């Protein structure tokens, strides 16, 4: 028997066949056959992310070839050897950074407040980069995070600060010139007190 009736793009014939034909339809109508909604497949569990950062403070990081000198060499290898990126690090904005300010102003505020020592440095950034894109996106999605413990001077005397940002499926180290604009999407990473 063939039915050419369609209800909202569903063929009655397909439903009839799914019930097992005439016999199945009779059992269904006699309440001998129950329809049970198929369980929806569960979403795969989120991968377990490792937020524990380990930094070998005895190894100095490599700098770009345009590098001339560190502004604060005493901070180059400072900081804890191990910390939880979720709980031991905070994103910090300078006063006025909710809109747009120059990097020079952020640096001046950090120096004035004696806060540079609480900032993460390039060593930390390289260790965070090794944690991978999933960890970075979980904590810093859509942001460039700056490592003010490693402000450097180039051969022309201009100051830059390293940062981490996502590029495709990678965490990339970049450098921000202090004469550039910073916004709320460009926080400093600092160790929590």
What are these regions (language model features)?
Residues 1-118, 123-193:
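A binding-site-centric feature that preferentially detects glycan-recognition modules on secreted/surface proteins
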């Amino acid at each position: 028997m063939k039915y050419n009736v369609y209800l909202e793009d569903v063929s009655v014939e397909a439903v009839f066949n799914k019930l097992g034909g005439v016999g199945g339809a009779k059992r269904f109508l006699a309440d001998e056959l129950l329809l049970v909604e198929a369980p929806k497949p569960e979403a795969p569990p989120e991968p377990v992310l490792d937020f524990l950062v380990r930094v070998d403070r005895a190894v100095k990081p490599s700098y770009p070839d345009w590098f001339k000198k560190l502004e604060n060499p005493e901070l180059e290898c400072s900081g804890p050897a191990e910390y939880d990126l979720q709980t031991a690090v905070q994103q910090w904005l300078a006063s006025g950074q909710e809109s747009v300010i120059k990097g020079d102003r952020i640096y001046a505020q950090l120096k004035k407040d004696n806060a540079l020592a609480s900032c993460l440095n390039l060593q930390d950034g390289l260790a965070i980069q090794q944690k991978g894109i999933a960890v970075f996106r979980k904590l810093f999605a859509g942001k460039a995070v700056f490592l003010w413990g490693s402000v450097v001077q180039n051969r022309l005397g201009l100051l830059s600060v390293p940062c981490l940002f996502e590029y495709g499926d990678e965490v990339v180290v970049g450098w921000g010139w202090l004469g550039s604009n910073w916004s709320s999407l460009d926080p400093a990473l600092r160790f929590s007190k």
